[in-house]
Amino acid sequence: MSENQNIPAIEMRGVNVGAMRDALFTVIEGMDWSMASGEFWVIAGQEHSGKSDLLMLTAGLMPPVAGSYKLFGNDTRNFGEAELAERLRVGFVFQGGNLFNQLTIAENIALPLQYQKDFTPAEAQREVRALLELMDLSPLADVTPSNIAANWRQRAALARALILQPEILLLDNPLSGFGARHSNWWLRFLDQLSRGQGQFGGKPMTIVVTADDLRPWQNAHRKFALLRDNKFIPLGTWNEVETANDPVVKELLAEPVELTP
């Protein structure tokens, strides 16, 4: 847990976010962002705007090209093996799940526990079973990812990200390709996490999601930002999003989606 509630969970100053395609280039320039613990941010943008790259940087999986990024007040430029515990306070759900096909669903979920030496094998098994049940994944525990549908793979990836009970949860386009039923499940579940309800009750979880479509995420308690023209543009609340005079925002709002949070 963060010792000082006044310290932002995420703080970026003058950050340039890089991406590796054929060569390294900058996709976001001069980014300033401060996110308090317990906030829920939705970062929208068109394809190749840098959404996934920003989440990779936020998770500590790659460094900024320029600028400073502090995670719970600690400068990530100074992170080494000793700071692994700080990175474990962040859970990451990749778009598509990014599970290991040679492992079962239960084994995939258990993977992060290898970094936690406090867990006995019996305790680890209990944690995995609890998450399997919570995600309705118990019947698929011994199945490999390639043999289940995409929506269940994505749930398993979420369970893996939650196994260490992170303080920050990052999700890359979690509603992509899902119909209303599965999307509604995600919206309800993330809303519970952000409010500190359910199995992870007690403290609201800090959540960042990326999105191609803003409509499903409308909620008065969430904050929104846009990636456009290599810039990170805070939009504010949902009311401010709806009244924003920005052509990209209008495009992301163009097609209403009948989903309920």
Language model features with spans:
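Short coil-to-helix segment of the ABC ATPase nucleotide-binding domain corresponding to the Q-loop/switch region
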Residues: 102-111
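Conserved ABC ATPase "signature" region
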Residues: 122-140
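Conserved beta-strand-loop-alpha-helix hinge in the C-terminal portion
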Residues: 231-254
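Helix-to-loop junction immediately C-terminal to a conserved catalytic motif
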Residues: 59
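Conserved catalytic motifs of ABC-family nucleotide-binding domains
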Residues: 165
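Conserved ABC ATPase signature
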Residues: 144-148, 152
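ABC ATPase NBD coupling module
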Residues: 76-91, 115, 121, 244
